[in-house]
Amino acid sequence: MIVRTLDDITDTERDVRGDGWRAKRLLVRDDGVGFSLSETTVDRGAKMHLWYKHHNEACFVIDGEAEITERDTGTVHRIGPGSVYSPEHDRHTIRVTSPLRLVCVFNPPLTGRETHDAEGSYLPATD
């Protein structure tokens, strides 16, 4: 059984930071559960261009608000506490209007140290 807390992750290699965001990777590929699970926080005012080409992602909003724009269609979605979104490999931009706290699941699971590449994606996992 895996039992872990956010405090266990803080300031370890599973506590990953980027420009305006932070992800505490509670479950990763090496845990062997078939998905990864992170608590992700994004700063107010952050604008991120994302495109998860190699992963499926689902995010549940705990706190905060943002707008997600589907870059291929221009469709804008407003999200807040209780919202879930799953981009399905869509290119999207997230604009955070109040500090955002999310629970994010990725499949295939993240290894734990990923950061976004120039296209806003994570590279595929290698064995």
Question: What function would you assign to each model-found segment?
Answer:
Residues 41-42, 53-68:
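Short, conserved beta-strand element in jelly-roll/cupin
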Residues 21, 36-53:
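Conserved short histidine dyad/triad with adjacent acidic residue
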Residues 47, 58, 83-84:
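Residue-level marker of beta-strand positions
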Residues 62-63, 80, 98:
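A cytosolic small-molecule/anion-sensing beta-strand core signal
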Residues 1-34, 115-127:
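A short, N-terminal "cap"/entry segment at the start of jelly-roll beta-barrel domains
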Residues 72-91:
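Short acidic-glycine-tyrosine-enriched beta hairpin
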Residues 89-116:
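Ligand-binding loop in jelly-roll beta-barrel domains
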